Curated annotation (Swiss-Prot):
Keyword Hydrolase carried by entry: no
Enzyme class: transferase
Main location: cytoplasm
Organism: Haemophilus ducreyi (strain 35000HP / ATCC 700724)
Keywords per UniProt: Aminotransferase, Cytoplasm, Glutamine amidotransferase, Repeat, Transferase
Record carries keyword Zinc-finger: no
GO cellular component: cytosol
Active-site residues from the entry: C2, K605
Annotated protein name in UniProt: Glutamine--fructose-6-phosphate aminotransferase [isomerizing]
Enzyme nomenclature, EC number: 2.6.1.16
Length: 610
């Protein structure tokens, strides 16, 4: 959600900090700020509401200069978006930036006010600044003051602290919110995402839960929760240099929609061998665990939850294994029964989703045989804390509304289904080879769906004045309808809901009139006749129908509603295929509405707070 960048260098860091914030804009934010400290102990703090560009102009105008600094993009949780609530926050000579939520901030605020501290903002972060300032009065160092302060905090935090009296040092602390140290030569860095630091380093170490670190120009010292000096492995970052380049595309989301054929191809690479799923390529020793699985529990949020809902159909139909899918924020707060030989699967693009991480940590104490994650970021907390990981190969996804991460998650889930089905003897060699062939054809089939971009753009004009939309689907196309409704509401701000088509007469039919667009996913399959009956129910009440189907479904001759007739694809991969034209529909509607497609209001790319 929020973004953090910090630097200690022998050169001016103002440009480094601002560049880092620009690289984190995709995560979502409503305000931004920097604090820069020079060797003459002069600290400059500048904060602005709105885009990082406004902050950049202010930094240039104020001639901000110094070798140590911290910067932040804020997504409001406590206190409205305003300059006074933007980070960095200051207490005396202490400046602080923070990601996360301090759950006991109100109690701490009362104590600090009794000590004479005056609060300038309405944020929870300001208590950290005052706590550190208080502890520094008796501590021997900034490191000791931060260590004493953070043990008083309850909740999630990734925080970076700077002291005006110590202009060549930063102290950072992590609990529940990711932080990564970047190593340079005569300079070192800190950020909430390694992408922020790609212009200055490719050597990274990821802090673990409870770590506190002291960063200077020439050294990094890391201490665990017990205060013991520890080392964290330094990784050589292997990131896409051109991920931030939109190229010929107007938006990152559009670029990422069109990247899906190659993203799926990359996700399949190495995972198929001699016409079968290469189980060892899923994860080393995965076969030993997967062969014993008798139940699947999927936990995820948002788009990833919708991917899990599709996979439930596959697990039960292909692998003949029971599967539950839960929203992570619900799963972690209820009493659940763990089935024997049950595998927990978490799904997340970023691997830092707070509720999903919390659910994983709870589940690991609850008797699951193993915890697996399907994730797009190899260095993420979910990957590090799971027993094994099955990585999507979507590449960096910058648009807040997920596209290629969703379709590559589905690709991994289908591969996993086939692997379990074979290991448990529930899938014949011929059946496995047929599914594998369907997956191998999928990238080129999605390319054929992208050809319909102009036709879908024309269709989107009908939605220019609409405030509501319904999406309908049956079977595994119901969660595809759910995902399509989510995309539309995320980026166009149209109120969109999805229903299992058979539920129409149980309530949603009351909403149908001549002003209500109804989008139906209706390829030819065993449920098509049922879907056609639901379409007739909408037609009879004058609803505006938009049907996405294939030639075999027989909608070409229809004159009283609009259709996008797509090429036929194999049934098993059809849910992935139909996702793509529906993504295009949401994208073009958002363009007509004039919204911020890549950074929709109130939303963040990585939801790192609960």
């Amino acid at each position: 959600m929020c973004g953090i960048v910090g630097a200690v260098a022998q050169r001016d860091v103002a440009d480094i900090l601002v560049d880092g914030l620009h690289r984190l804009e995709y995560r979502g934010y409503d305000s931004a700020g920097v604090a820069v400290l020079n060797e003459q102990h002069h600290m400059q703090i500048i904060r602005r509401v709105g885009k990082v560009k406004a902050l950049e102009e202010a930094v240039i105008g104020e001639k901000v200069f110094g070798g140590t600094g911290i910067a932040h993009t804020r997504w409001a949780t406590h206190g409205e978006p305003s300059e006074i609530n933007a980070h960095p926050h200051r207490s005396g000579k202490i400046a602080v930036v923070h990601n996360g939520i301090i759950e006991n901030y109100e109690a701490l605020k009362v104590v600090l006010q009794q000590r004479g501290y005056i609060f300038a903002s309405h944020t929870d972060t300001e208590v950290i600044a005052h706590l550190v300032e208080w502890e520094l009065r008796t501590a021997h160092s900034l490191l000791e003051a931060v260590q004493k302060a953070v043990v008083q905090l309850r909740g999630a935090y990734g925080t970076v602290v700077m002291n005006q009296d110590d202009p060549t040092r930063l102290v950072v602390a992590r609990s529940g919110s990711p932080l990564v140290i970047g190593y340079g030569i005569g300079e070192n860095f800190i950020a909430s995402d390694p992408l922020a630091l790609l212009s200055v380093t490719h050597r990274f170490a990821y802090l673990e839960e409870g770590d506190v670190a002291e960063i200077t120009r020439h050294a990094v010292a890391i201490y665990n929760q017990a205060g013991e000096a520890v080392t964290r492995e330094i990784h050589q970052g292997n990131f896409e240099q051109d991920a931030a380049d939109k190229g010929v595309y107007r938006h990152y989301m559009q670029k990422e929609i069109f990247e899906q054929p190659i993203a799926i191809m990359n996700t399949l690479a190495g995972r198929i061998k001699d016409g079968q799923v290469n189980i060892e390529a899923i994860a080393p020793n995965a076969a030993d665990i997967l062969a014993k699985v008798e139940h699947i529990q999927i936990v995820a949020c948002g788009t990833s939850y919708n991917a899990g809902m599709v996979a439930r159909y596959w697990f039960e139909e292909i692998a003949n294994i029971s599967c539950n899918v839960e929203i992570a924020s619900e799963f972690r707060y209820r009493k659940f029964v763990v089935q024997p030989n049950s595998l927990l699967i978490t799904l997340s693009q970023s691997g830092e989703t707070a509720d999903t991480l919390a659910a994983l940590r709870l589940a690991k104490q609850s008797g699951y045989m193993a915890a697996m994650t399907i994730c797009n970021v190899a260095s993420s907390s979910l990957v590090r804390e799971s027993d094994f990981a099955f990585m999507t190969k979507a590449g960096i996804e910058i648009g807040v509304a997920s596209t290629k991460a969703f379709t590559t998650q589905l690709t991994c889930l289908l591969l996993l289904n086939v692997a379990i089905g074979r290991l448990k003897g529930r899938l014949s060699v011929a059946q496995e080879q047929q599914i594998v062939q369907s997956l191998q054809k999928l990238p080129s089939q999605i390319e054929s769906a992208l050809v319909f971009d102009k036709a879908i753009e024309k269709l989107s004009e009908d939605f220019a004045d609409k405030q509501h939309t319904l999406f309908l689907g049956r079977g595994e196309f119901y969660p595809i309808a759910m995902e399509s409704a989510l995309k539309l509401k995320e980026i166009s701000y149209i109120h969109a809901e999805a229903y299992a088509a058979g539920e129409l007469k149980h309530g949603p039919l009351a909403l149908i009139d001549s002003e209500m667009p109804v989008v139906v996913v209706a390829p030819e399959n065993d449920l098509l006749e049922k879907v056609k009956s639901n379409i007739e129910e909408v037609r009879a009440r004058g609803g505006q129908l938009y049907v996405f189907a294939d030639h075999e479904a027989g909608f070409e001759q229809t004159v009283d509603f609009k259709t996008i007739v797509l090429p036929r694809v194999d049934a098993v991969t059809a849910p992935i295929f139909y996702t793509v034209p529906l993504q295009l529909l949401s994208y073009h509607i958002a363009l007509i509405k004039g919204t911020d497609v890549d950074q929709p209001r109130n939303l963040a790319k990585a939801v790192t707070v609960e």
